[in-house]
Amino acid sequence: MTNEEFIDHMNCGLPVQCGSEIHLKMHELSQEALRITSQINGKYNPPDELGRLMQQLIGQKLDEKFGLFPPFYTDCGKNIHLGKAVFINAGCKFQDQGGIFIGDNTLIGHNTVIATLNHGMLPDERGNLIPSPVHIGKGVWIGSSSVILPGVTIGDNAVIGAGSVVTKDIPADMIAVGNPARVIKSIYD
């Protein structure tokens, strides 16, 4: 199975059964992600080397204004899609198998978790994985230690308060805070 076939399967939202070919490919990609993130996190890397490693991890050319403060962790890497001038602060964890799409000029605070996989709810199906992408618009600011759950879309220019758990879509231009995150006002108020 190629990386492209894996990404296509995951981006369709099809379940992944434990032990299946797609599950084995997921494990293979996770091992590569562990190897590359250990290089990112294991020592100081000048910005150009950090960019090269991140491009290798996600398989995408990065904008020269991309910023990352390690450590950074991801379970796959190949289904992260970054816009221009994205900044990811230290300690972030991306579970990207289901797809993480981040728009231009987005800021992601320390220790943010973005998850894209769920498990079956019935005990006999818990080993199965259900991918669901996360879409983060342009100009979004995600505060430190936030958790973004599978299937969420955050609209352009939204602000997510520190420590929030985002379980549902957040409209553009809104500020959302809390657990679960709730819209409290417009950024223009």
Specify the residue positions occupied by each region the protein language model found.
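Terminal amphipathic alpha-helical/low-complexity segments used for targeting or macromolecular assembly
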Residues: M1-D63, A181-I184
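Conserved catalytic segment of ABC-fold P-loop ATPases
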Residues: G155-A158, P171-D173
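Active-site/ligand-binding-proximal alpha/beta "capping" segment
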Residues: T153, T167-K168
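Flexible, glycine/small-residue-enriched loop-and-beta-strand segment within the central core
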Residues: F72-L82, F87-T153, N179-D189
